[in-house]
Amino acid sequence: METKRIFNGKHDELESRLVSDFIGNTPFVRLSEKSYAKLESVNPGGSIKDRPVKWILDDAEHNNLIRPGDTIVEATSGNTGIALAMIAAERGYKVKIVMPSDMSEERKVLLKMFGAELIEVDEGD
């Protein structure tokens, strides 16, 4: 599939890009004369957790441990699950997220938007 965009009057030919292609391409910000930080909040999932989840899935695929259509189950209370659901959606995996029932509605909605099935548990379950 070929997509054309126009920037400043010029056509830009795009290859099909994946969300995970943008993980890790985060800027350095200067904190002081000798200190810099990576701005991980610029990752597509909004957190540093995008990096390890991408690496884990890349490694599992490379070693033929998972393939599209498989189901991945993760116990999480937040950013790892969001990153997993986001990347799994683009790669064709099903995701089940086990999370505390008291997590924010925003997180639950975001996970569902990426197609994750939520399994909510109460404290002590």
What function would you assign to each model-found segment?
Residues M1-D125:
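PLP-dependent amino-acid enzyme catalytic core
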